[in-house]
Every structure is written in C-alpha cells, then in structure tokens.
C-alpha cells in the first residue's frame, strides 16, 4: 500500500480507469463475437449490420484509449475479410 497521498489517489484513479476500460473492452469483444456468430451462421445481411456495429464500437474504444488504433484497424480488417469471403 502506498504511503504518499498522491499515490493513494492514483491507486483509486487507476482502479476506476481499469474498470471502465474492462467494460468497454468487454462490450467490443461481445460485438465481435456476435459478428463471428453471424458469419458462422451464413447470414450475410446480419453479418454486414453487425460489422458496422462492431467497427463503430472499436472506433469509439480507440478514441477512449482502450485499444490502440492499429489493433482496432487489424480487427476491422479481419472482420471485413471474413465478410468478403462469405460472398
């Protein structure tokens, strides 16, 4: 446990940020999972709609600093590739 007052505050701040990041990351992963399920089911219309939702969630998480922009771009690219393979 920290003894310095500012470090005690940082511990609290870091915990809040960790929980916020965890919630955002979990939501993004859920959207990606839904996209993969739509692709696996062979439902192209649902997959296209879910790709839009997942991409938007990824972009929002990048602006909040949860994912690195290159990591999000990679995930979006892989999802687009999976969607294009369905055709």
UniProtKB/Swiss-Prot annotation:
Gene Ontology CC annotation, any one: small ribosomal subunit
SUPFAM superfamilies per UniProt: Ribosomal protein S20
Example GO molecular function: structural constituent of ribosome
InterPro entries the UniProt entry points to: Ribosomal_bS20 (IPR002583), Ribosomal_bS20_sf (IPR036510)
GO annotation, biological process: translation
Assigned keywords, A-Z: Ribonucleoprotein, Ribosomal protein, RNA-binding, rRNA-binding
One Pfam family recorded for the sequence: Ribosomal_S20p
Residues spanning the signal sequence: none
Annotated HAMAP family: Ribosomal_bS20 (MF_00500)
Entries under PANTHER family matching the protein: 30S RIBOSOMAL PROTEIN S20 (PTHR33398), SMALL RIBOSOMAL SUBUNIT PROTEIN BS20C (PTHR33398:SF1)
Family stated for the protein in its record: Belongs to the bacterial ribosomal protein bS20 family.
Function: Binds directly to 16S ribosomal RNA.
Name of the molecule in the record: Small ribosomal subunit protein bS20
Species of origin: Corynebacterium diphtheriae (strain ATCC 700971 / NCTC 13129 / Biotype gravis)
């Amino acid at each position: 446990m920290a003894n310095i007052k500012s470090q005690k505050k940082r511990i609290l701040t870091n915990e809040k940020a960790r929980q916020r990041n965890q919630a955002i990351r979990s939501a993004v992963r859920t959207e990606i999972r839904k996209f993969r399920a739509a692709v696996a089911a062979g439902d192209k219309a649902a997959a296209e709609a879910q790709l839009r939702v997942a991409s938007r969630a990824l972009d929002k998480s990048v602006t909040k600093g949860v994912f690195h922009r290159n990591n999000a771009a990679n995930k979006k690219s892989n999802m687009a590739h999976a969607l294009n393979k369905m055709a």
